[in-house]
Amino acid sequence: GDLVVVRVQESVEPGEIGVAVIGDEATVKRIYSDGNIVRLVPENETMVPIVVMRTDPDFRIGGKVVAVIRKL
């Protein structure tokens, strides 16, 4: 139920929370890059990180999360 405010940009600094787009789905994760490998790490430690190749044509960074608005 939270809303996120995203600054549209093509990259984020390592460990920043961003929006990653894979195919037609978007996900909010901490983003880490190591060469051609990108790890999308969830804040929820019970969830498994997603690993994707930077060169995957279905993958892109959609932007950086700059704020979270929580509903009361």
Regions of interest found by a model, annotated:
Residues D2-L72:
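Acidic/glycine-rich C-terminal interaction modules and beta/coil loop segments
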